[in-house]
């Protein structure tokens, strides 16, 4: 497909999405929920064919030398498919927010003014590796009354095509236009350039992937962008804290799964608890094969314990390590003077995604919540909870690190906007 044909192709997708968006925006909640339930059933019924398509992607990606963490993201297990099927059913069970009027107040003139929640219209989703995003994005589009154009990574093209075909089938079975969810069927990068430059059809772009992708989209897009940046998440172990709880959380936040963007990449430890805490967590990390990139103070403490030093992979940290999203069994470790230095470090080096404090001090917890400039800030909980399902959103289309429109996990409400509605009884302005 040459550049001219790609431009025509994307214009066609845009027009079809815009037309479909008007129909799905006014669809009753029962119809949208029926489509979601249909999709959940189809995912379960087609498990074998979906995994066969995914296997073709995995084999091609492995032969091309795709890195281990990205291969992990590409894989569609039976558990992954059941999770997205359950997500569709959970969305179907959630209240429909479209048409909801909030903040209705009577003004001195007698008019009543409020805001109605309405669909955005058409969103374009650009994402890498994870084929389950196809279902997450499609299901949220359906529930929120939007249309969407999906452009997944070339490494997942077979998986995405198989999943998108089921979405279209579910929509048609429910009496909704199949074009409400469309997958860009070419892996040519020119399609991305076209998608982000169609303001006449696309109302917002949501890129989800590496920093290079996000920066390119943000720079070149001619429509608004909701950014899902990388996840350089931190856990800060405060003085005072419950050491046993801190060890449990720091272990889970890093090792429960390495590839998600909400996995912890940086561990900050208050000097007052470092001698008690660091040897315990280092023993766990060492047993699980986690490389520890330590500042001088942390390394000094760990080297003083021969039993740990003999099994642990302790490496001097560089300045770049404080910025790094590893997506791998690697963690940076730094000893800090206290909560203020921890906050300053996080605000300087983090990606403003998710950061947690583990503490017994209420004032420290409140200061951390107020001053850490991240989309999700936690007290005494694992960063792995930064997820739409865990936050009760039913599903998420990404975790926005922006400060406008949507911040944190973007669920149904993040895919809507508010318009003012005015109710009068014949009032005129004097």
From Swiss-Prot:
Molecular function GO terms recorded: glutamate-5-semialdehyde dehydrogenase activity; NADP binding
One Gene Ontology term from the biological process aspect of the record: L-proline biosynthetic process
Pathway in which the depicted protein is active: Amino-acid biosynthesis; L-proline biosynthesis; L-glutamate 5-semialdehyde from L-glutamate: step 2/2
EC number of the protein: 1.2.1.41
Keywords: Amino-acid biosynthesis, Cytoplasm, NADP, Oxidoreductase, Proline biosynthesis
UniProt-listed InterPro entries: Ald_DH/histidinol_DH, Ald_DH_C, Ald_DH_N, Aldehyde_DH_dom, G-glutamylP_reductase_CS, Glu-5-SA_DH, GPR_dom
Pfam annotation, one family: Aldedh
Compartment annotation: Cytoplasm
Domain of life: Bacteria
Cellular-component GO terms for this entry: cytoplasm
SUPFAM superfamilies, per the entry: ALDH-like
Chief localisation class: cytoplasm
Catalytic activity: L-glutamate 5-semialdehyde + phosphate + NADP(+) = L-glutamyl 5-phosphate + NADPH + H(+)
Its biological purpose: Catalyzes the NADPH-dependent reduction of L-glutamate 5-phosphate into L-glutamate 5-semialdehyde and phosphate. The product spontaneously undergoes cyclization to form 1-pyrroline-5-carboxylate.
Family indicated by similarity: Belongs to the gamma-glutamyl phosphate reductase family.
Entries under HAMAP family matching the protein: ProA
PANTHER family: DELTA-1-PYRROLINE-5-CARBOXYLATE SYNTHASE, GLUTAMATE SEMIALDEHYDE DEHYDROGENASE
Official protein name in the record: Gamma-glutamyl phosphate reductase
